[in-house]
């Protein structure tokens, strides 16, 4: 996967959802160890934890992976049937909160927009 595909998706997000706050997480823990892929974030979401206070994190995350791009929609688990919303998205793998694909041209961008918009509506960010 070339960096220009990631940049293409980030540019698309910024043009489609310009009001969302942007952030970046380098994927490292407090000790500096790489624990996940670097992720570009859009929006802000209060993640609740059973053991401690909540923490503000991005709601829409975009990460480059070995197999392509993953878009994470946080805060929708149990509130939105993402696979049903994305059933006609094209060449992508869709789980309960993640849409993974190789290139933007492999998917229907209007369905991706719909899924992100619905996720934002669930958490009142849109």
Q: Which residues does each PLM region occupy?
A:
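Charge-dense, helix-prone N-terminal extensions
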Residues: 1-126
């Amino acid at each position: 996967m070339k960096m220009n595909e990631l940049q293409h998706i980030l540019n698309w997000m910024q043009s489609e959802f310009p009001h969302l706050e942007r952030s970046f997480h380098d994927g490292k823990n407090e000790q500096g160890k790489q624990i996940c892929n670097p992720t570009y974030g859009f929006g802000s979401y209060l993640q609740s934890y059973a053991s401690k206070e909540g923490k503000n994190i991005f709601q829409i995350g975009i990460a480059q992976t070995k197999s392509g791009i993953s878009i994470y929609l946080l805060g929708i688990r149990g509130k939105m049937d993402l696979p049903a919303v994305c059933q006609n998205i094209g060449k992508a793998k869709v789980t309960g909160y993640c849409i993974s694909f190789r290139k933007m041209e492999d998917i229907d961008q209007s369905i991706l927009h719909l899924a992100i918009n619905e996720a934002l509506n669930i958490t009142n960010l849109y």
